[in-house]
Amino acid sequence: MAEPIDAVVLSLDEVHALALRVLTHHGLSDAHARAIANVITQGQRDECHSHGVYRLLVCVRSLRKGKVDPQAVPTLRRLSSSIVAVDAHRGFSLLSFETGLPVLVEMTKQHGIAAMVINRCYHFSALWPEVEAIAAEGLVGIAMNPSHSWVAPEGGKEPVFGTNPIAFAWPRPGGMPFVFDFATSAIARGDIELHAKQGKPIPPEWAIDAQGRPTTDPQAALQGAMRTFGGHKGSALAAMVELLGGALIGDLTSRESMDFDEGVGATPCHGELAIAFDPKVFLGDDLDAGLARGERMFDSIVAQGARLPSQRRFDARARSIANGVRIPRALYDEIVALLD
């Protein structure tokens, strides 16, 4: 039996307070720090460890590199009656999302469908908190973004794509939304970083080494290239994200973002695209019937013992709200040391 990991137990309020202290200590404005602390706390709460308090190390590293503007104030520009663009001005993305969300919701409820573009942002976070926020308004949400070119196309050896996540949320009456958020790479970059940090091997289907050979060594994977999920299908979706979340919105592709970094190793700088749909506008008087169709499909999935996406997160959420979260002692100490 494996030895239990020495851990620190914190309430969610304590996690949020710790994140806020670390972020403001390193020069982030209160608005940026609160937006980031909110999402980091959500990640830790839902046991998404690669996007929980571990990301404080990532944020601070990027701030120390001098690329991110810790005081940037996002600005809004309406491109049309149903498209809003938020310029992050080289700040982290989360405050820009918070800034643009009310406008996206307003436009979607007016027109039935609307889009929000975030430009020139440093982006390190999961997308599910964002599409969940859209679903909390009774809307359907999709979000996507490129990153750094860490991922080789299927059949290739050289990195071209980012991890290029796609997230989707569907509101459910009286329950948690139907949500998925997955990288088009075989795994999130942060998971390989955590394996490297903990000295654990990775599955060979996650990555290739610098010579293009499948590897179980996370350090070799970080020096080589990640693989797409689902072979050519994942490759095609990754390319779609580059086009919609990069070229279409006038922002960097993953290769361009990597070049922009100039070897500094900061969080990727690029854009993001979020699209929202209002079921009330699409369905009108048939709204209840349309939502009921979705519920019947969900019932048919769980009735046979299958699990809806994000159910593991929702179960973890309930545990964390009741019992707090466990943070490995070594990681906790590393985070506290950021306050020195």
UniProtKB/Swiss-Prot annotation:
UniProt-annotated binding residues for substrate: 55, 163, 189-190
Residue positions binding NADP(+): 123-127, 181-183, 232-233, 307-313
GO molecular function: oxidoreductase activity
Top EC class for this record: oxidoreductase
Domain of life: Bacteria
Presence of keyword NADP: yes
Organism encoding this protein: Burkholderia multivorans (strain ATCC 17616 / 249)
Keyword NADP attached: yes
Annotated EC: 1.5.1.49
Keywords: NADP, Oxidoreductase
Family listed: Belongs to the LDH2/MDH2 oxidoreductase family.
Quaternary data: Homodimer.
Job of this protein: Catalyzes the reduction of Delta(1)-pyrroline-2-carboxylate (Pyr2C) to L-proline, using NADPH as the electron donor. May be involved in a degradation pathway that converts trans-3-hydroxy-L-proline (t3LHyp) to L-proline.
The protein's name: Delta(1)-pyrroline-2-carboxylate reductase 2
Alphabetized Gene3D superfamilies for the sequence: 1.10.1530.10, Hypothetical oxidoreductase yiak, domain 2 (3.30.1370.60)
Catalytic activity: L-proline + NAD(+) = 1-pyrroline-2-carboxylate + NADH + H(+); L-proline + NADP(+) = 1-pyrroline-2-carboxylate + NADPH + H(+)
Matches recorded under InterPro entries: Mal/L-sulf/L-lact_DH-like_ah, Mal/L-sulf/L-lact_DH-like_NADP, Mal/L-sulfo/L-lacto_DH-like_sf, Malate/L-lactate_DH-like
Active site per the UniProt annotation: 50 (charge relay system), 51 (proton donor), 191 (charge relay system)
